[in-house]
From Swiss-Prot:
Gene3D superfamilies: Putative methyltransferase TM0872, insert domain, Vaccinia Virus protein VP39. NCBIfam families: 16S rRNA (cytosine(1402)-N(4))-methyltransferase RsmH. Transmembrane segments: none annotated. SUPFAM superfamilies: Putative methyltransferase TM0872, insert domain (SSF81799), S-adenosyl-L-methionine-dependent methyltransferases (SSF53335). Specifically methylates the N4 position of cytidine in position 1402 (C1402) of 16S rRNA. This is Ribosomal RNA small subunit methyltransferase H. One of its GO terms (molecular function) is rRNA (cytosine-N4-)-methyltransferase activity. Pfam families: Methyltransf_5.
């Protein structure tokens, strides 16, 4: 089996292509993964006769993902550049590449597919899933210093409760945090996902469905905290807005309410026009917003796609276009 066969099918690929590929230029896949969305973008550019004057830049902090993407996109090498880095640094990474190659750094489209990949979930050694026994790791960048084990074994009860509540929206955050601290004091440090999952199972009543919901919230919270996912998301959205040229588009796919809330607020905030001081009636705004929202409501996967790829069930795709800078 080829490396890329173990990676996920691209979620909402047709919708991404239809909303993002409008013309030739520089396209940035800020969450390259195994390269499945990048491949769909390259194929669309080729089909529309836009490939020869286009470049796709893929960014990922996961070395395994970069290796898989390089294999998948090998035939497209003249039109691709693959970079290792956190997408929060996307603006500087892309600018450095453009400077090195003597390119004008005006980006036509940016894609962000948020969250953990199927490959990462399915690889026990990465420690992302409660369904597989592995080390408590959860790092997107496996060279980063902070692991889930460091967090779960050294954070105090108040900090753990905060993480479980704010990043997992876990209603029993305090009780779970207290139980974690009590167990590590009695039995020593947690080392595996299985040990943490076993504790949650003992504390959760209401059957397997309730257990799975609690485990999902807890593991999500730890993953977000380990990788500072929400902080990185705020930064990459600002970076994407900076990179885009006039009419360039930003497509963001989220998988849980915390991510989607950040994206929705960012789009709404930057789409607002300046109507001047309150109490002054104007027929037209003083200036337009930086963005125009393309998808008034998020695009969702069809029933057919969800049947083929259950990961698509929770996906929400939001797209916005950068306005040409001008004063109205």
């Amino acid at each position: 089996m080829a490396l890329h066969d173990t990676y996920h099918d691209p979620v909402l690929a047709a919708e991404v292509v239809a909303t993002l590929v409008q013309r030739s230029g520089i396209y940035v896949d800020g969450t390259l993964g195994g390269g499945s969305h990048s491949l769909a973008l390259l194929q669309a550019l080729q089909a529309q006769g836009l490939l020869e004057s286009s470049l796709l830049i893929g960014i990922d902090q996961d070395s395994d993902a970069l290796a898989m993407a390089a294999e998948r996109l090998q035939a497209w090498q003249p039109y691709t550049r693959l970079l290792k880095g956190n997408f929060r640094d996307m603006a500087s990474l892309v600018q450095q590449l453009c400077d090195a190659e003597g390119r004008a750094c005006a980006v036509t489209g940016v894609l962000l597919d948020l969250g953990v990949s199927s490959f990462q979930l399915d690889t026990a050694e990465r420690g992302f899933s409660y369904m597989r026994s592995g080390p408590l790791d959860m790092r997107m960048d496996n060279t980063a210093p902070l692991t889930a084990a460091e967090l779960i074994n050294h954070a105090d009860e108040a900090e753990l409760a905060r993480i479980f509540y704010h990043y997992g929206e876990e209603p029993r955050s305090r009780a779970l945090a207290r139980a974690v601290v009590q167990q590590r004091e009695k039995m020593g440090n947690f080392t595996t996902t299985e040990e943490l999952a076993a504790l949650v199972r003992r504390l959760t009543h209401g059957g397997e469905k309730a257990v799975i919901k609690t485990l999902s919230r807890l593991f999500q919270a730890l993953r977000i905290a380990v990788n500072d996912e929400l902080g990185a998301l705020h930064e990459v959205l600002e970076g994407a807005l900076e990179l885009l040229d006039g009419n360039g588009r930003l497509a963001v796919m989220s998988y849980h309410s915390l991510e989607d809330r950040v994206v929705k607020h960012f789009f709404t905030h930057h789409a607002q026009c300046d109507w001047g001081p309150k109490g002054v009636a104007l027929r037209e705004p003083l200036s337009q917003g930086a963005l125009t929202i393309v998808t008034k409501r998020p695009m969702l996967a069809s029933a057919d796609e969800i049947e083929r790829n259950p990961r698509a069930r929770s996906a929400k795709l939001r797209v916005a276009a950068k306005n040409q800078p001008k004063t109205i």
